[in-house]
């Protein structure tokens, strides 16, 4: 079966809508959320082709690929190997952001309310895909950070820019 559009998101459905519903999952790595055309297989063996229109939003955790009388098939994210950076001072944040930005490493930012085990009490974090040279740099500077597996809410992307 070819999927050409998303049928909503499981996280937007009321709990009672999911009672007695057979739920299958398609586990995707973060990078595959941006792919418009791909072939996937659910954890129950259902094969699907995905062919989304150009300009369609990226896939995200919980997107419903298929909904029929047998149940639903949803997108689940494979955890990503990331470095979570929790600078203590504004100067430390500026130095790290400047140097990692010069390396064009895509980053995501989270506020103090977002929990990151091992970095409790942070004032905000910067998250990048794991890179051993970035980790070495952070260790050299003595910046508080942790390597962890995490399901990221959106894919890492490079921002367009010019020099």
From Swiss-Prot:
Spell out the InterPro entries in the cross-references. Answer: UreE, UreE_N, UreE_N_sf
Q: For this UniProt record, give its keywords in alphabetical order, as a comma-separated list.
A: Chaperone, Cytoplasm, Nickel, Nickel insertion
The compartments listed are: Cytoplasm
An example Gene Ontology molecular-function term: unfolded protein binding
CDD domains according to UniProt = UreE (cd00571)
BP GO terms, sorted: protein folding
CC terms in the record's Gene Ontology section: cytoplasm
Which Pfam family, giving just one, matches this sequence? UreE_N
Belongs to which family?
Belongs to the UreE family.
- Briefly, what is this protein's role? Involved in urease metallocenter assembly. Binds nickel. Probably functions as a nickel donor during metallocenter assembly.
Return the protein name.
Urease accessory protein UreE
Q: Which organism is it from?
A: Actinomyces naeslundii
Q: Which gene encodes it?
A: ureE
